[in-house]
């Protein structure tokens, strides 16, 4: 099966912190943000909570293994992206954008007002968002 995006399932939860750590290594190349590479990740329990809400999606490779994820939570009529991470080996291939588009499609189909994300705008890969 080709790489694709699907809703996360409980068995994915223990795999997601590794992806977040891998993705965060890219911050080492940004002055003043290297500390993010060593920052705490979302806990497995928090991932399980978001998976239970059906607001967590994973980008899986051709072998079906998660390589990226987007975790979000509904706040009133908004969907807030809590974490978006793509492992280094899949970065630069559009998977982050596809995950965001998936969350936006979810928000539209559930008649939510907007999708929010808190990010660093001066980081090149964050700028489009």
Regions found by a protein language model. Give the residues of each.
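Conserved GNAT acetyl-CoA-binding A-motif
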Residues: 107-119
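Conserved GNAT-fold acetyl-CoA-binding loop/helix
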Residues: 18-46
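Conserved beta-strand in the GNAT
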Residues: 58, 65-73, 80-85
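A short beta-loop-alpha structural element at the N-terminal edge
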Residues: 4-18
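A short, internal acetyl-CoA/4′-phosphopantetheine-binding micro-motif in the GNAT/acyltransferase core
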Residues: 84-91, 119-121
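Conserved acetyl-CoA pyrophosphate-binding loop and the N-cap/start of the following alpha-helix
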Residues: 90, 94-102
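Conserved active-site alpha-helix within GNAT-family acetyltransferase domains
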Residues: 97, 109, 121-129
């Amino acid at each position: 099966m080709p790489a694709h995006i699907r809703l996360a399932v409980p068995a994915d939860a223990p795999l997601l912190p590794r992806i977040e750590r891998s993705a965060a290594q890219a911050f080492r190349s940004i002055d003043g943000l290297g500390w993010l590479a060593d920052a705490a990740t979302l806990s497995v329990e928090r991932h399980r909570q978001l998976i239970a809400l059906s607001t967590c999606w994973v980008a899986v490779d051709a072998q079906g293994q998660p390589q990226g994820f987007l975790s979000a939570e509904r706040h009133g009529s908004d969907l807030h992206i809590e974490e978006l991470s793509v492992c280094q080996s899949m970065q630069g291939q559009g998977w982050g954008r596809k995950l965001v588009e998936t969350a936006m499609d979810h928000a539209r189909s559930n008649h939510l007002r907007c999708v929010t994300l808190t990010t660093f705008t001066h980081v090149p890969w964050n700028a489009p968002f």
